[in-house]
Amino acid sequence: MKKTLLIILFLIVSLGSFAQLGEFVVIGNNTGFKASTKANAKAIFRGKYSSWKNGESVTIVLPSTKSDNVVSVASQVYGLTVKGMQKYWLEQVFQGRSNAPVFFETDEEIINYVKRNPGAVGIVRASRSVPQSLVIQITE
């Protein structure tokens, strides 16, 4: 019985992470795709792309240092502390490798910004209500 429950729990967790990056959902507006691998999603959030295949400019939208989920985003997406993530972006911007991300304090602000700005891609908690049209499915 315990084994069956563990298998069911594993399946639920596995299926739940299909559209997510850890405890987060990746959202985008006019990015030219609706699915991405986890590795590619992390590359996007690390500023490896300046424009989407459809020609739209990439705008990365992240939680600000005042956000209650910034520690988790820094850890799960960047593998860094919050200060490490800030340093990473300062280096990227000042070396001319990427445009600076846009930062917001709440998930709702991130969702609204992505909705209004073609080319924007953001990350919000999976527990938030996000329009399905913005969700980018993440696979292994």
State what each model feature region is.
Residues 4-16:
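Sec-dependent N-terminal signal peptides
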